[in-house]
Structures are given as C-alpha cells and as structure tokens.
Amino acid sequence: MPTLDWLNRAHAFTVSARVPYRLLEQVSVHARTPGGHTTPPAIPAAPAQAELVKEPAAAPTLPSKPTHDNLLIQGDNLEALKALLPFYRGQVKCIFIDPPYNTKSAFEHYDDNLEHAQWLSMMLPRLQLLRELLREDGSIWVTIDDNEGHYLKVLMDEVFGRGNFVANVVWQKAYGPRSNAFLLSDSHDHMLIYGKSKPTLRFGLLSRSDEQTAKYKNPD
C-alpha cells in the first residue's frame, strides 16, 4: 500500500506513545448564586496545571469510570486524548473531528498555516490515539478541504487500514460563486469516514416518511 513520506515522519510515529499521561483535574461546572440560580463559572486565564505521571509508559491509577458522562476538557488536544485512554480505550462508538484545514486562515486558538510536513506530523499522533479510543464497530468522521484532503486520505489509510475506508462524503459549503476567487470558486468540502473494523460497522437507518413511501407504487 502506498504511504506518505515527509520530514520527521519517523519522529511523528512515536509521538503518541511518548505523550505523558496527565490526570484530569475536575472543576465545578456551575456556580450557584444567592438567588438559587446556576451560572457558568468564569473562564480561567490559563488551563489548570495537571499532575504529571512519572512513568508515561504506564497508565496512571484512575477510577474505572468517570464521575460524569459528559466531559469538557481544556488543554492541548493531544494530551487530552492520551488522558482519555484509561477511561475510554476501545469504547467510543463515533468520533467527529474538524481539524485545522491548513489554509492560511486566521484562527485564534491554533495555527492554521502550517507547512505540509508539520501538518501531517500534527495529525498523525492524534489519529493514532483516536483509533485506540474507537470500539471495533466504531467509526471516525473527519471534515477537511481540498488543501490537505488527499494527503489526509492516504494518511488515514495507513492509520486505520485502507480496507476500513467507508466513504468520502462531499458536502456543499457555498451556494454561489465567490467574487474574490482567483481561478475557480470551490463550493464543497469533504468528510472522510473510516471504521475501526469495517465488517462490524453498522449505521442506523432512518425510517421512511409517509411522503417518501407514497412515491413507490409496488409494495415490498
């Protein structure tokens, strides 16, 4: 199977294993006012420091189940994914991510203007950890545009296995031409879908409406 090669590729393949486990520090989600109402807490100026486990090769001793079903984690997403492994390894049914498109757009919270090699090195360890979180019948859905979409497809073939590729869903993002387009005005982006184990993958089917059923003349 063809694979991508880029500067620091060998290093990128070891990043997910070398990222240290960090304990998640639980904070209060709501603060109660004197009147009895609940309000969101103030956003801290910087993420709270997490305790660094001395031996990153081994998972820390953590509760068998998180205190809450819903988690909102503030911090580097690579470290956050590693911190979730002891809780959710092999248990997640569906993952959706919207990574940086690497299109020279201005974003406040991450660099959206990386060189191709840097972008691939950023994506690889995160995809590796995401695969570990998936159940055998789980799937991952990734939105991307033409700028890195084809490189991402080959990279995900390597991480998830080409045989586990489900589809490239093309979705329309614009309904009219852009006046500032240099050559052609693109109107679509992509969503790459992979299963961890495609033979076990099942999607829930939507029920047919009466209006849709009325279009069929022959009974099933």
Regions found by a protein language model. Name each.
Residues M1-F96, T103-A117, M122-P125:
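DnaQ-like (DEDDh/DEDDy) 3′-5′ exonuclease domain used for proofreading
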